[in-house]
Every structure is written in C-alpha cells, then in structure tokens.
A protein has these predicted regions:
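Extreme N-terminal basic, low-complexity initiation segments
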Residues: 1-10
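Alpha-helix boundary/capping motif
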Residues: 10, 15-16
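Non-catalytic helical/linker scaffolds that mediate oligomerization, partner binding
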Residues: 16, 21-382
C-alpha cells in the first residue's frame, strides 16, 4: 500500500524542480511568505487584476503562481499578459489550457432563452441571440446526435438537439435561462474531444519560447492526455493536470501518477457529478494525490462571495479550513482575483485562513492530517 507522505515532504519534492522565476532565490528572499504547512496560493489574473498595481500587491504577498486562463484570454493577448506580469513580479506564471471543453460564443448582452423556443446551433462564430448561438470547437458537430442535451453554464438554459442541419444543429429550449458569452457547455452524452485546442498548442509554443515553467491541462481524462501534453511542454516544466470531469475521476490514479501536481476544479466537476457528491470526491482525490506524493490544488468558490462583497461567509472560511484538513497543498482563487471587487483583499483573507489553520492544526494534529483510506466511488461516477 502506498504511504501517505507528510505535507512538507511533498512540498519539498515539488519545489526542488526548476521553474521560470527570474529570481532563483525567490523562496529565500527577505519578507517572503513562509508557510509551515507548505500551502501554496495560485491566483487567476483577469480584468480586475491584470494591471501593474494589483500584480505588485500580489507579488508583495508572495503568492506562488499567477494563472493565465486561456479560456478567457485571446491568444493575441497572451504575450502582453506575460510581459506585464514579468515587468512587475518574479512569481512564476502558469498557462491554463482550454482543454477538452465546449463553450458558446459571444452573445448579445442580457440574452434569455425562453422555454419551448427553437434555436440554431452553429460551428462558425456569430453574435448569439434568441435564434442562434455558436459553439466551439466545431468538431463537436461531427459526433453530435439528436436528443443530446446541452446545459449552458451552471444555472443557464438547457437545450435538446432535435435535428442536424448542414454543419450545425437545431435544438429546443427545454429549460429557459440566461446565456452569457463564452460560457461552458455540458453535453450529454459527452463528445470525444482532443485534450488541447489549436489555441492551447499555440499558447504552449509561445510559453516555450518565453520560458514559462508551469502549464495546466484542463479536463484531463486519461494518462494519454497527460502524455500528449508532456510532449509539448519543456522537459523541466511543471504539469498540473486538472481533474474536473467524470472521466478524470475514473482515471484519477493514472492522471496523478503522470503529473507533477493535480488541481480539483469543483465547479466543472459539478457539471458531471451530482453537486452533493463533489465534497466526497474532493476528499478522495486529495487522499489519492497524497498517497502518490503529488501536490494537489483545490479550486472554485473558495471565497465566491468576495467576488462582489468585501468579506466572505463563515461557510467559506470553514470550507478552506476543511480543504486544508483534507490534505490539500494549494488553494486557487479564480473569479475572486480575476473579476472580483477586491482581488488583493481575497488573497489577504486566504492568508488569514492559512495562518489560522497553522496556529490550530499543528497543535491538534502534530503528525499532520489524519490519514484514512479513500472510500469507494459511488454509482453516479462509475
């Protein structure tokens, strides 16, 4: 049976590998954040934070990774984002791929689809409205079948395909709802998609030229997906595989083994697994990663209320504490720092939560989080 490695041992293994920091002594600089628990913080940059003022504030707090989300960044803007970050900070940059996911295109502001209405689904970019929307990648239309269902975003409209026409499809709105631009679309049955988009490949090539040392594979589904990305990134780069689909859960062990770290995206995972079971699978994946001695990050909704408010809820603070008690080694701020009202305040709150965890946890559990064998998977995944 695999041994559960102490948190410090796992962190040491991770940090010994080279990364793209411009300062090789970054971890030992005066004023650098030092965490007894080895908890890493990854911050997503976006409209609220991709500017010199905020990047410098994040650097001052010694966050561990700055994430560029390719799902919300145009390929022509990636170079400028990297240059801006490097001009203000030596924090390593992570390029987070689009991966094997479906998204809708641009739509008119305030679009609401009414239950019972008909809509055309198109493979070519259009300004979406109540009569038509575009989906990408266009390859999904090659295997799309009648009666396939589509859910747009978490609380958006649900569509059912009633027929194919030309290169696109026709659908009926079974549950009305709001549709916003560039939102994830969940299709059942799930289409077969390559692990990387053309945009991902172009971004990775740019990252290689610029010395980017961290890459995240979205929607990792198998060891083959991981291996295919390994072939493209630099040999000394970190590969973080994101477990955020049913296939990723079923193949978690082979994905973990082939990666330098894994990231649990609870939001996307909840599209394919019942919401009430996501906390259970978080614990399973964290324990498996610990047993394979690989760092594991947890993302989505850690401080969701701070996207629009100055303070989190007690439930969110409790979630962070329990995530760390589970054995997670990294916390990911996404919307909180990308589009939130106070990106720096969100990081400060995470730092406070980590500090409280260290003050209390190491007194209560001096040997680390209680290790327990992961329970079996439920029928909803298998």
């Amino acid at each position: 049976m695999l041994r559960a490695a102490p948190r410090s041992e796992i962190r040491g293994t991770y940090d010994e590998r080279p990364h793209a920091s411009t300062d090789p002594q970054r971890k030992r600089r005066p004023g650098a954040r030092v965490s007894m628990a080895g908890v890493r913080i990854m911050c997503t940059l976006g409209p609220a934070s991709l500017n010199p003022v905020v990047v410098r504030e994040l650097d001052a707090r010694r966050v561990d990774l700055l994430r560029i989300n390719l799902s919300h960044t145009r390929i022509e803007d990636v170079r400028a984002a990297i240059d801006l970050i490097r001009a203000c900070s030596d924090v390593p940059i992570s390029l987070d791929t689009e991966g094997a996911q479906v998204r809708c295109g641009s739509v008119v502001p305030g679009l609401i689809l009414e239950t019972g209405s008909m809509i055309d689904l198109l493979p070519t970019p259009v300004q979406g409205d109540a009569h038509r929307i575009s989906l990408r990648p266009r390859s999904i239309f090659e295997t799309l079948e009648p009666n396939a269902t589509m859910t747009i975003d978490f609380q958006g409209a649900t569509l059912r395909v009633i027929g194919l026409r030309g290169n696109g499809a026709r659908a009926v709105v079974e549950r009305g709802g709001r549709v916003e631009s560039n939102r994830a679309v969940t299709i059942a049955p799930a289409p077969s998609l390559p692990p990387l988009t053309r945009k991902d490949v172009a971004a990775i090539e740019l990252g290689r030229r610029l010395g980017i040392g961290h890459y995240a594979l979205s929607f990792a589904a198998s060891k083959e997906d991981v291996a295919s990305v390994r072939e493209l990134i630099p040999s000394d780069a970190h590969l973080i595989s994101k477990i955020e689909s049913r296939a990723g859960v079923l193949n978690m062990d082979e994905i973990i083994v082939g990666s330098d770290a894994v990231l649990i995206d609870r939001g996307d995972l909840s599209r394919e697994i019942p919401l009430e079971e996501v906390p259970y699978y978080q614990k399973v994946i964290v324990r498996r990663a610990n047993r394979w001695q690989k760092p594991v990050y947890v993302a989505t909704n850690l401080l969701e209320s701070m996207v629009i408010n100055g303070r989190p809820t007690v439930a969110e603070a409790n979630d962070i504490a329990n995530t760390l008690l589970d054995g997670a080694h990294g916390l990911v701020l996404a919307a909180e720092t990308a589009i939130g009202v106070d990106p720096v305040g969100a990081v400060d709150m995470v730092l406070r939560c980590i500090s409280a965890f260290e003050r209390t946890h190491f007194r209560a559990f001096p040997e680390g989080s209680p290790a327990a064998p992961p329970p079996e998977m439920s029928a909803s995944v298998a």
